[in-house]
């Protein structure tokens, strides 16, 4: 049975109040597919609470969590004694994540680590595909390199993908707070951890929901 809605959620970055408010207005059901585009952690103050929330989302809908580069950095730091890799993660927002766990790695539940490890590289449906950051237009999704899939910004807009599907991505913050819609690629990272919004976007209908990091809903007349 085809989903009633296929909803992409942009980069959350530790903004649990925004995620809670967004889910309240989107109200996902078992008839919906929700694809989270990664970067649940870092920068915002509530990474632990965000992971708690997203781990519960499979009870509400068909939930597809993608991995972002910040999840990769966190997992790399937790599994590695290399001081450079740990410092790199902390500098990129990991300090806020650690603070949400009381500043102690021992407070990070195994279930949270297991969730981060379970996040997918990509997801695709008939006419759309979802990745965290970017893609190489000539390669199938299964052959995309990590540095592009998780790290490459949209500074150089990719050509339409060989599959003919529209790409839905996060990672490149849209500082205006508005989604970037180039027809063949749509970016829904709208800078929630800064002065923007957390966005949910139904790719089937084009319906859009946005809240700021304190949970205020953006009204239609504001965009």
Q: Model-found features: residue ranges?
A:
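N-terminal active-site segment of His-dependent metallophosphoesterases
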Residues: 1-53
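Short, glycine/acidic-enriched loop or turn micro-motifs at the edges of active sites
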Residues: 13-14, 42, 71-72, 135, ...
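A general structural motif
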Residues: 3, 29-31, 60-62, 126, ...
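Short, glycine/charged-enriched secondary-structure capping and boundary segments
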Residues: 21-24, 49-52, 79-82, 144-146, ...
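Active-site glycine-centered loops adjacent to acidic/histidine catalytic or metal-binding residues
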Residues: 11, 38-39, 68-69, 171, ...
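Residue-level marker for buried hydrophobic side chains located in beta-strands
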Residues: 8, 34-36, 65-66, 129, ...
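Acidic, His/Gly-enriched loop-helix segments that form or flank divalent-metal centers
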Residues: 91-197, 203-221
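Active-site neighborhood of divalent metal-dependent phosphoester bond hydrolases
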Residues: 43-124, 154-158
């Amino acid at each position: 049975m085809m989903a009633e809605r296929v909803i992409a959620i942009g980069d959350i970055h530790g903004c649990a109040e925004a995620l809670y408010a967004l889910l309240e207005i989107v109200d996902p059901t078992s008839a919906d597919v929700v694809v989270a585009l990664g970067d649940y952690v870092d920068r915002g103050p509530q990474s632990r609470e965000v992971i708690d929330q997203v781990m519960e989302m499979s009870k509400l809908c068909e939930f597809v969590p993608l991995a972002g580069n910040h999840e990769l950095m966190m997992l790399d730091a937790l599994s590695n004694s290399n001081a450079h890799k740990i410092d790199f993660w902390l500098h990129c927002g990991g300090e806020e994540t650690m603070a949400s766990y009381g500043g102690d790695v021992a407070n990070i539940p195994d279930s949270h680590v297991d969730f981060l490890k379970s996040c997918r590289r990509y997801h695709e449906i008939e006419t759309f595909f979802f990745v965290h950051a970017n893609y190489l237009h000539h390669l199938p999704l299964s052959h995309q390199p990590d540095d592009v899939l998780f790290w490459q910004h949209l500074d150089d807009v990719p050509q339409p993908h060989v599959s003919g599907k529209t790409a839905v991505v996060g990672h490149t913050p849209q500082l205006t707070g508005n989604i970037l819609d180039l027809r063949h690629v749509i970016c829904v990272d709208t800078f929630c951890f800064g002065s923007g919004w957390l966005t949910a976007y139904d790719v089937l209908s084009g319906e859009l929901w946005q809240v700021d990091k304190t949970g205020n809903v953006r009204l239609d007349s504001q965009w």
